Amino acid sequence: MAALAKTATSHIADELIAQAVASIKAAEHFSFPFPHIFFRDFFPTDFYQDLLRNIPTEGYDPITGTGTRMALRLYGDNVEKIEPELRSAWAAVSAMLTSKEVERAIRIKLNDGLEIRARGDKVPSAEDLKLVAKPVVYSDSDGYQIKPHPDTRKKVVTMQLYCPADTSQQALGTTLYRASLKGLMHVGSYCLEPVKTIPFFPNVGYAFVVLKAYHSLTKMSWHGRPTIKTDRPRISILNTFYMNEHVGF
């Protein structure tokens, strides 16, 4: 791991936090089909390139019965499962993603969605919603898919960081949907209308507030991924903010 392994985790984490917060602050905000943001340059460029060369190979668990999705948890003691020579950098990534600074940046940028969520959850305001970050590295292989879904109510904010080496996997991003009459023509997407696919570009990502029917019938956070075709893993980091520390993956 060379330079990264020799640098103190806390120093790396501070640099990562500063970059991540700046990225989120500069993110594009969209309210259609539901409140979400798209951000670029989430990691410092040199760190990102080094990180890609040092994706962990140990500590993953299968998520799908087909084995097309493998997951490596990056929170709590799970970081200790990562190879020792890679651990300091990934511990810094974990510290950044679970930091109060990143949480605050997300709260500010997605305040409109959090206000909708708060009303549906019957809490006084968005500030009363608890956000507990639990990041996970995902490695998806050829054939992986997940049908459109709004996410479980245990999740308050879903945030995904794309980690490809180049733009050749750009078609493999997450698709956002909405319920509409046009959706009846899209049997493959369970009669939901695809609105857009967020390109799977290097060092970019998105985040949205999880909204169910009781939060808003017109702003439900429908998203999914049609079957991917790829000759190499699709690597991403899902940083999910849960409603409390007792739930999550």
Language-model features and meaning:
Residues M1-F32, L184:
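Fe(II)/2-oxoglutarate
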Residues A2, G143, P150-K155, L172-F249:
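Catalytic core of Fe(II)/2-oxoglutarate
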Residues A26-G113:
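Non-heme Fe(II)/2-oxoglutarate
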Residues I37, E83, R87-L97, E101, ...:
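Active-site rim elements
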Residues D41-F43, C163-T167, L211-A213, Y242:
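Short loop segments at secondary-structure junctions
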Residues N54, E58, D166, N244:
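Phosphate/oxyanion-binding loops and surfaces in catalytic or ligand/nucleic-acid-binding neighborhoods
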Residues L97-V157, P164-Y177:
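Non-heme Fe(II) oxygenase catalytic core, chiefly the N-lobe of the double-stranded beta-helix
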